[in-house]
Swiss-Prot record:
Localization, UniProt: Plastid, Chloroplast
Keywords from the named record: Chloroplast, Plastid, Ribonucleoprotein, Ribosomal protein, RNA-binding, rRNA-binding
The encoding gene: rpl21
Family per record: Belongs to the bacterial ribosomal protein bL21 family.
SUPFAM superfamilies: L21p-like
Protein name: Large ribosomal subunit protein bL21c
Principal location class: plastid
């Protein structure tokens, strides 16, 4: 069993592992237009770190724990169509929305500023 962590970002909780990539909607307070590919990121909202033998749970977050990663690219999610119609009023409105996503890869899971679990090359 590989080491993994549970983080909170973009209003979601994600189970992350080193070497895997994830799509996040609202990346904390970071603006996706200002972040280019290969930008380094640190995520401090780590809820849990699980090793092969130990589980560390924070209340609500673990102190000294962070996730190191880098941004691969930003992209748009699939289009959602919103159609509003009022019957017998001849009022119709059709809108579409594409959510901005950021794809990032987890390089390592750190606890107490030590790299515990790194990406396997």
């Amino acid at each position: 069993m590989n080491a993994y962590a549970v983080i909170e970002t973009g209003g979601e909780q994600l189970r992350v592992e080193p070497g895997r990539f994830y799509d996040v909607r609202h990346f904390a307070s970071l603006n996706p237009e200002n972040l280019g590919p290969n930008s380094k990121i640190l995520i401090y909202r780590v809820l849990m770190i699980c090793d092969e033998s130990t589980i560390n749970i924070g209340h609500p977050w673990l102190k000294g724990a962070m996730i190191k990663g880098r941004i691969l690219h930003s992209r748009l999610d699939n289009k959602i169509t919103v159609y509003r119609m009022r019957s017998k009023k001849k009022t119709r409105r059709k809108l579409g929305h594409r959510q901005k996503l950021i794809r990032f890869v987890v390089d390592s899971i750190c606890s107490d500023v030590k790299d515990l679990y790194k990406q396997k090359d």
